[in-house]
């Protein structure tokens, strides 16, 4: 069962996330963005301009543009998870992960997103506002392995700078050491060494 991260207290509890069709059209939402009333959170999801962003709000925003079955069957991962945690830019194409025991062909058909088949450990998934997201540690390990150095290094540094995420360079390194052998593991260790500001061993 996903772990529940402790929410960050916010002055505006559960600000609305608005998408086309309820109760405004896409044109009306864009007009309110132009007027400075709303700001775009991700794709077609908008929030009041004065509300403070938090991981829970970004998770809700992402869920609002996905079909409910995707929200229930997938886990937000990689750079999209880093965005949820406030450590990466807004993704143009959300990255979703699905457990290797599930079928993913039907998830790829009609959505502008990337779906990867992976395997999860018992502590790899947390829940934010009802949305499953890879844990900070799993996210950091995935970024070190799967993202280009120029992308992963600054994002990992931002993640390590957030005390709430509970990450250290040593913890990420141990996460990599716990993985079975795979093609990009040596490069991932070099990425973590760069983040630590030390030469790779």
Show which residues each predicted segment covers:
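Short gly/ser-rich loop at a beta-strand->alpha-helix junction or flexible surface loop bordering the NTP-binding
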Residues: 1-201
């Amino acid at each position: 069962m996903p772990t529940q991260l402790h929410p960050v207290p916010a002055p505006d509890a559960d600000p609305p996330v608005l998408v086309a069709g309820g109760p405004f059209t896409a044109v009306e939402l864009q007009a309110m963005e132009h007027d400075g009333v709303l700001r775009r959170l991700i794709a077609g999801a908008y929030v009041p301009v004065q509300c403070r962003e938090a991981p829970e709000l970004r998770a809700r925003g992402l869920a609002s543009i996905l079909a409910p079955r995707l929200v229930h069957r997938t886990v937000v991962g990689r750079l999209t998870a880093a965005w949820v945690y406030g450590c990466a830019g807004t993704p143009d194409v959300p990255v979703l992960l699905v457990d290797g025991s599930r079928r993913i062909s039907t998830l790829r058909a009609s959505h502008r997103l990337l779906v990867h088949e992976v395997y999860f450990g018992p502590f790899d998934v947390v829940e934010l506002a009802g949305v499953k997201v890879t844990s900070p540690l799993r996210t950091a390990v995935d970024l070190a392995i799967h993202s280009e150095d120029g992308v992963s290094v600054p994002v990992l540094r931002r993640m390590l700078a957030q005390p709430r995420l509970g990450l250290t360079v040593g913890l990420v390194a141990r996460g990599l050491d716990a993985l079975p052998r795979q093609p990009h593991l040596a490069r991932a260790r070099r990425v973590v060494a760069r983040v630590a500001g030390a030469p790779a061993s």
